[in-house]
Amino acid sequence: MANVSKKVSWSGRDLDDDEAAPLLRRAPRLGVPAGEAAPLLNGAGPAAARASPHSAFFRIGQLSSVELDDELLDPDMDPPHPFPREIPHNEKLLSLKYESLDYDNSENQLFLEEERRINHTAFRTVEIKRWVICAMVGILTGLVACFIDIVVEKLAGLKYRLVKDNIDRFTEHGGLSFSLLLWAALNAAFVLLGSTIVAFIEPVAAGSGIPQIKCFLNGVKIPHVVRLKTLVIKVSGVILSVVGGLAVGKEGPMIHSGSVIAAGISQGRSTSLKRDFKIFEYFRRDTEKRDFVSAGAAAGVSAAFGAPVGGVLFSLEEGASFWNQFLTWRIFFASMISTFTLNFVLSIYHGNAWDLSSPGLINFGRFDTETMVYVIHEIPIFIAMGVVGGILGAVFNALNYWLTMFRIRYVHRPCLQVVEATLVAAVTATAAFVLIYSSRDCQPLRGSSVSYPLQLFCADGEYNSMAVAFFNTPEKSVVSLFHDPPGSYNPMTLGLFTLVYFFLACWTYGLTVSAGVFIPSLLIGAAWGRLFGISLSYITGAAVWADPGKYALMGAAAQLGGIVRMTLSLTVIMMEATSSVTYGFPIMLVLMTAKIVGDVFIEGLYDMHIQLQSVPFLHWEAPVTSHSLTAREVMSTPVTCLRRREKVGVIVDVLSSTASNHNGFPVVEDADGTQPARLQGLILRSQLIVLLKHKVFVERSSMGLLRRRLRLKDFRDAYPRFPPIQSIHVSQDERECTMDLSEFMNPSPYTVPQEASLPRVFKLFRALGLRHLVVVDNCNQVVGLVTRKDLARYRLGKGGLEELSLAQT
């Protein structure tokens, strides 16, 4: 494979030879002089530090010994796949700091014994507990959404009333600059506080959280992503961001919030609060937590948009790595409970206890399908709007990509991140004030349709229409663009608003604040969509079908689809949020067109940020041009193996060694020197840590020093924060003891032959949610180990198949 000639890190500093040397410990190959470097099988240069050739001899407790054909290790052989030799950007890196989650149960003796003890009644009890947890997730997610909505409404109302009174007073007496300073200062103060708690307390709470949850459901362990502290900072941060007037929405973070709630409730304890409620202990493993997090994400979507079916489809389309019929029912149940809880509580809050008219945080309002019909000749127009949405979405993502690269390189300190967020808040308020001040688009005031009408230089009984878009929460601005009657907006007002808000939203996404991109995208699209509808109405002579509100809806769908590239779930979400199936087909056409056009230029926003964070994310399928690659070409070698009965000192050394960077170790039979050591099972680092902590040694067991036999509960109690090996004290005498791994290892790990193609390996690994896949030869000897990073290194780029470089950062 090709060597990578340049190592790029976020610090922008290359590794020189002296720095790269310790990362590789190359064993000499037979026939290669001792001082000569052996070639790399896996194609990564010194910076990758992941593959070294096979040693000539089997060293139990250290390296696998199976040699490969000499021709495969020939340094003079041309690489069969010409990969690029220059890696210029961060998205060409794959970070080694991310670990994988265990979405495959280790079927060792302890696990099988416990499963055999579960009778029909116990099994039914476990199933009932699953439904109870999903109900609790739905209720709590709905309550959190209510809390966010009520607090935002109160604080935003207080801020806008204060600024409005100030503007009205100074409009008469002069001195509107004081109003500008007040507005900018209030926005900056809220955002300063919101950014500070995110940057200094829990950085993973930044953004919408959707990319992080996608990675979690994909099988990547993102530190702190589902902790209680993250939830508290997320909720507080999104309130402060929205009240601070940023071009953000509170709907996206609800997905992250629901996921954190699900992850916490399903474990029956809080490691942050150090409280164990001794319930739901059976679900303390990654496989169970993954399913509940899927339900939490769906409940978040349901609470945000009042779209329970859309929530289920969102979990399916955007994240879930495992799916079945029973899981679908539970996720749908959690989504329905979430939207009902939100509906019920908000109805009581608004004084309509039995009305149940608030199904989500945002309600797009019901479109009158009798008057706002669409005709067959509008379908090409909708497709054209999808093309525009795809192009604008690609421009948005491209600008945000370069902005994110700049932030990674130069705005990586928390204090600088807070300063940038505060600056954006002040600039947003200033831009809004200047546009409102400059606008002369005055419209007659219609009852209470406008929440905070600004008169400024308009006549009595009129309001400034530019203020409706800026001087309001983004959710209410979207509804205004959808439902305000024709003639409510001047085309110049909509054009200026679209242009300014587009760049403000692009600048805002990626700040160190808790915020989402759903509502800003809808608002941008609704603005240019309404402008499109006004133009069409003018051209057609105010035809009945050319309603600006209808085209505002299509523009909103096109813009959001062009940015995030979701089709199935977004179609249903928009249908449920508008309470109308009539526009289902046009919305689907618009979203599909926007995705197809946008994908021609650049990835979707969430996938782009996942790549920029160098996360080893596995897509649904392997790269289409990767069939010529085999398992032996992508696997990690050499492999650290352990014997069934291994010395404690060897295990401690293996776990302490930085060279043993895998979290799974093949277990081989005790070789007597005459027979090759064959694969017997696989044991995880976390299991070895628990065994060492409880000192499960053969000698102690034979002397009766073990108080009891280790149970599966002991491993669940240590989950998920297993102690580091440095915290476990092992005396010199204990190092000479022996540990029997037979009872704790997985005796039937998944294996593949070394000739298996990459797509076949990828399909097995991805479909089963594996963390380790052992590569064996015809004699069942360990040849290598395939991990998530080995598969994620290969992807289809513009010039064909690309191989990413591995980095420690």
From Swiss-Prot:
Transmembrane portions of the chain: 131-163, 178-201, 227-245, 251-268, 326-345, 379-409, 414-436, 491-511, 516-539, 583-601
Ranges of the Cytoplasmic topological domain: 1-130, 602-809
Residue window of motif Selectivity filter part_3: 516-520
The keyword Lipid metabolism is annotated on this UniProt entry: no
Compartmental location: Lysosome membrane
Keyword match Ribosomal protein: no
Catalysed transformations (reactions): 2 chloride(in) + H(+)(out) = 2 chloride(out) + H(+)(in)
UniProt subunit comment: Chloride channel 7 are heteromers of alpha (CLCN7) and beta (OSTM1) subunits.
Official protein name in the record: H(+)/Cl(-) exchange transporter 7
Organism the protein comes from: Bos taurus
Gene this chain is encoded by: CLCN7
